[in-house]
């Protein structure tokens, strides 16, 4: 469960990161494809090379969805309902992949935010991304 302090830290960090959605999202996806090559199977129609328009576009979508989750942090289930349905029923993404992408997002945020991504912010974001992943995986039950 996210505390009031966690929510504050997440919102402050997101405010700094949100202007870089396309870059950070693309970098997180590329990290995931490199570290976990099995995740590429969900993107057979994508040009998976660094800087491709498809990677940048999807990265921006992923981080925009995360921004929506930050904005609706007190009602993640409602905010993520459409994405949960899409990933569970249409795309049939294995829920473990949400955790893999979450790890890559953490690395990107830490790499670019430096001191602003303190251990406290990291811990809060870890809880937040776990909550988002749990909501996205909720339709699989």
Swiss-Prot record:
Annotated transmembrane regions: none
InterPro entries found in the cross-reference section: Globin, Globin-like_sf, Globin/Proto, Hemoglobin_a-typ, Hemoglobin_oxygen_transport, Hemoglobin_pi
Residue runs in coiled coils: none
Job description of the protein: Involved in oxygen transport from the lung to the various peripheral tissues.
One term of GO molecular function: oxygen binding
Tissue specificity annotation: Red blood cells.
Residue intervals of the Globin domain: 1-141
Residues reported to bind heme b: 58, 87
Annotated gene: HBAD
Provenance organism: Coturnix japonica
Protein name: Hemoglobin subunit alpha-D
GO biological process: hydrogen peroxide catabolic process
GO CC annotations on file: blood microparticle; haptoglobin-hemoglobin complex; hemoglobin complex
Subunit structure and binding partners: Heterotetramer of two alpha-D chains and two beta chains.
Keywords: Heme, Iron, Metal-binding, Oxygen transport, Transport
Similarity comment: Belongs to the globin family.
Keyword Iron among record annotations: yes
């Amino acid at each position: 469960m996210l505390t009031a302090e966690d929510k504050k830290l997440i919102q402050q960090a997101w405010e700094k990161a949100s202007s870089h959605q396309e870059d950070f999202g693309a970098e997180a996806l590329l990290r995931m494809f490199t570290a976990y090559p099995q995740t590429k199977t969900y993107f057979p129609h994508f040009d998976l090379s660094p800087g491709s328009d498809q990677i940048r576009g999807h990265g921006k979508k992923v981080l925009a969805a995360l921004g929506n989750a930050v904005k609706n942090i007190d009602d993640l289930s409602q905010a993520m309902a459409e994405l949960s349905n899409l990933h569970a029923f249409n795309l049939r993404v294995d829920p473990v992949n949400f955790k893999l992408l979450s790890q890559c997002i953490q690395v990107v945020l830490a790499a670019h935010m430096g001191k602003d991504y303190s251990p406290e912010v990291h811990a809060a974001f870890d809880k937040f991304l776990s909550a988002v992943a749990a909501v996205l995986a909720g339709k699989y039950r």
